[in-house]
Amino acid sequence: MDPLGARSCFVDADILPCWADVSNEEGEDVPDGGRKDVPDGGSHSPFPYRKDINEKVILWKGDVALLNCTALVNTSNETLTDKNPVSDSIFRYSGPELLEEMQKLKGCRTGEAKLTKGFNLAARYIIHTVGPKYKTKYRTAAESSLYSCYRNVLQLAKEQGMASVGFCVITTQKRCYPLDDATHIALRTVRRFLEVHGQALEKVVFAVTEEEEGTYRRLLPLYFPRSLEEEQRSILLLPQDIGNSDGEPVVPERQIRISEKPGVQEEDSEEEGLVKDLSVIGSHAFARMEGDVDKQRRLALQGQLSGAAMQKQHQRNYNRWLSRARTEDLSDIAALKALYQSGVDNCGRSVMVVVGRNIPVLLIDMEKALLYFIHMMDHVTAKDYVLVYFHTLTGEHNHLDSDFLKNMYDIIDVKYKKNLKALYFVHPTFRSKVSTWFFTTFTVSGLKDKVHQVESLHQLFTAIPPEQIEIPPFVLDYDARENGPLFTSQSSFLSL
């Protein structure tokens, strides 16, 4: 039982004034009464005055962690370890049990929502979500991800039968999302959800800071007008993009028309296509697509696609990955220090190092990990190189799935395979040796002769001088315990 007064800091959402009772910008009370017909010539707002919806919405300046509601929202990163004022406060008030629970979640992708208990909070549950990082050239992707955050939180609350939800501002300052743009998405997504599923939620609280309050108070009337007059005033202030019926951002040029008869062969409609207006060719977003990818794969499987065509197709695919790797923000993957370039081996070849223990497979976006691998390796693989993989003290959660490795092997450019001269597998286990043998024998047989199982750093140093490779301290400590102090020895690697 909590000591007397321990929860005096918490605020009951039910006693907070709803948006319908808050005075408008002129400082006058908002007129009550039902909706009337819009006068002739008046514009119809896509977000009409709804007193019943306004009574469910609350704007509150305060710490979301202090809300007494069914669930509150925590904004974090993909490993759920972000340090920001919202998360810090939630962890502080919830107690150490939350940290233990978070480790079981195994991360959260951008736009997703995951549920934990509230523990020592007044709220029964915490819904964790990950907002997007904002870059102007990827604005559309960021908008879609942010919409998914709010929509998935609301959907989860509905599925769990929650009565009230307390939202923080999901986009943190470090993710650089403009507050105005983020607020538009937040408000319209909640509005559209309440229009359809209003019976599922009694209260939705927007918990904001003093800096955020002004923006929310200015934009709330656009999506939650408190009178017919406010509705009419707000029409001209609405942005051009108000999303679809769910509030989701829509990019017209990316909408694809689905064929009425997808099973019919392309030849059946060939003549019809000739008479269509040719002026539209090249005007849509997919004009540069070269052929039917699925058809090319099918022909390849049937042996009907030439080697040159397959090579060209593979090169185009790799170039797309490389382009993404050069433009996306991969700082969270780089911070793991799981892949880095070191010196050169005895033959003057570049040395790339992979630290298995630093790869939290279950907590990171593996697609971003692949992009980072391409980003780091593309220039190195232009000439001969060697790869050192430290398997030292890895756990089950560090082991890369064979399907991921096969997919990576299929995606990377031919120079990666051609110019790789040796792969040193340091501190292998019996299980890793068996797995490596199966993988290099049956999945990527071209790699088998290049793999060398290295039991100790003594062996590794016969191929790579100690001063030419950066080794993590825990690897040095492990090797000293298992194999004794470092000393110079001869090995078959001298011939490599």
Curated annotation (Swiss-Prot):
Domain Macro: 44-224
InterPro entries: CRAL-TRIO_dom, CRAL-TRIO_dom_sf, Macro_dom, Macro_dom-like, Macro_GDAP2
Signal peptide: none
Record-annotated CRAL-TRIO domain positions: 329-483
Pfam families recorded: CRAL_TRIO_2, Macro
Top-level division of the source organism's lineage: Eukaryota
Family matches, as CDD domains: Macro_GDAP2-like (cd02905), SEC14 (cd00170)
Region ranges (Disordered): 25-48
UniProt similarity note: Belongs to the GDAP2 family.
Name listed for the protein in its UniProt record: Ganglioside-induced differentiation-associated protein 2
